[in-house]
Amino acid sequence: MGEKITAKVETITPEIAKTMLGENVNNRRISRDNVNLFAREIRNGEWRFNGEAIKFGKDGRLLDGQHRLLAVIAADKPLTTLVIRGLEDETQQTMDSGKTRTLGDVLTLRGEKKSTQLASLARAVYLADQLGMEAAAQNDLKPTRGEIISFIDQTPQLADVLAASRAFRSQSGDMLTSSMFASLWWTFAHIDTDAANRFFTSLASGANLQADDPILILRNTLMAQLHKAGRSTRDNRVRIAALTIKAWNKWRKGKPLRQLKFSAGESFPTPR
């Protein structure tokens, strides 16, 4: 290839991507989550030409771009991108050393206020809205930035979520994470907005509740595990969501509650 460095915009088909990946030696460990995320963006038409390049060394070795190439294959759709060839192999050590632009960064560029909080809550609400509360608590799926931005643009009610989250946190502290609160409030508000506001106001304050009130039982349960290790694990997130839904269902029926449990293997409750 010689000493010359070339840069050219090329259309990478799945077949070309496979050939390029054949020159992949000593590249980063593959993140399947990232591959799947990029593939969804390509499939959805969300991928935009932004100047990021697939890079090859002087000897033809792939230095950067394996996740994008794998995503082209997974999406089974072509991608137009910049391809740079002829780089020194040592330059691979400096690649991807900059800070990745987050969804919060993108929202800031759009002029959104409280962009970091909006990004976090919008993602949680999106999962609850599209897949249900159990999936939101599991937090396994990684929506694309395009999916979340589209959801934000189409969901002005997210302003209500932000306001409710701030009000709850100011009274309750860390009883529920902001993301957990947002997804639960959204789910309950779709059933009865006024009831959802009253439920979480009482949960935050704990005022004027009878000993067998489901909200008080839930509050005591959440406060007891507030500082325990493992609170943010997947299983515990699912447990907290399930307990909150159980308390909500009992409270909506006007039924007393003595004990609140969610056992391993138990079906996730449906909010009513």
Regions found by a protein language model. Name each.
Residues M1-G86:
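Short alpha-helix boundary/capping and kink motifs at helix termini
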